[in-house]
């Protein structure tokens, strides 16, 4: 998988049918009950972060959490509930093969979300 970054994300707002710009994303490494911050970013107009969350070669085996601050995003739209139903969405996942590319998208509406390991 030469040329691919280690860990990336993408946020899509399926209620509006477009990428979700301005979503704050935090990445932590999880060891037992301890969460160690790795990085924080905000999605751009394409719903992606400007840089990989972890570069290829720096990705380590272990458990990670991506936290998406979706309430702040949805507060900007009339169709969302007040207060928004979803506040933060936290995805916990495990990295086994550090030579691979881990793309962890969030597909969301104001009331639901899903994820998958993309390419």
From Swiss-Prot:
- Coiled-coil residue windows: none
Task: Tell me which EC number(s) this protein carries.
Answer: 3.5.2.17
Q: Which GO terms describe its molecular function?
A: hydroxyisourate hydrolase activity
Gene Ontology annotations of biological process type: purine nucleobase metabolic process; urate catabolic process
Pathway this chain belongs to: Purine metabolism; urate degradation; (S)-allantoin from urate: step 2/3
The cross-references to InterPro entries, in alphabetical order and at most eight, read: Hydroxyisourate_hydrolase, Thyroxine_BS, Transthyretin/HIU_hydrolase, Transthyretin/HIU_hydrolase_d, Transthyretin/HIU_hydrolase_sf, Transthyretin_CS
Q: Which reaction does it catalyse?
A: 5-hydroxyisourate + H2O = 5-hydroxy-2-oxo-4-ureido-2,5-dihydro-1H-imidazole-5-carboxylate + H(+)
Q: Does the keyword RNA-binding apply?
A: no
Residue numbers binding substrate = 10, 48, 116
Q: Which enzyme type, at the first EC level?
A: hydrolase
Which Pfam families does the annotation name? Transthyretin
Keywords linked to the UniProt accession:
Hydrolase, Purine metabolism
Tell me where the transmembrane regions lie.
none
UniProt-listed SUPFAM superfamilies: Transthyretin (synonym: prealbumin)
Give the free-text miscellaneous remark of the entry: HIU hydrolysis also occurs spontaneously, but more slowly.
Indicate the quaternary assembly: Homotetramer.
The entry sums up its family as follows:
Belongs to the transthyretin family. 5-hydroxyisourate hydrolase subfamily.
**Purpose:** Catalyzes the hydrolysis of 5-hydroxyisourate (HIU) to 2-oxo-4-hydroxy-4-carboxy-5-ureidoimidazoline (OHCU).
- Recorded protein name is 5-hydroxyisourate hydrolase
> What species is given as this protein's source?
Deinococcus radiodurans (strain ATCC 13939 / DSM 20539 / JCM 16871 / CCUG 27074 / LMG 4051 / NBRC 15346 / NCIMB 9279 / VKM B-1422 / R1)
């Amino acid at each position: 998988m030469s040329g691919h970054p280690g860990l990336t994300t993408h946020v899509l707002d399926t209620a509006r049918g477009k990428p979700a710009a301005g979503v704050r994303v935090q990445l932590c490494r999880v060891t037992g009950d301890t969460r160690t911050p790795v990085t924080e970013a905000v999605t751009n107009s394409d719903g992606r972060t400007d840089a990989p969350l972890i570069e290829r070669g720096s990705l380590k085996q272990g458990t990670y959490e991506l936290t998406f601050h979706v309430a702040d995003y949805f507060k900007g739209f009339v169709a969302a509930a007040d207060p928004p139903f979803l506040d933060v969405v936290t995805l916990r996942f495990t990295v086994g093969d550090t030579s691979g590319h881990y793309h962890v998208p969030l597909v969301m509406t104001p009331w639901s979300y899903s994820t998958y390991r993309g390419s």
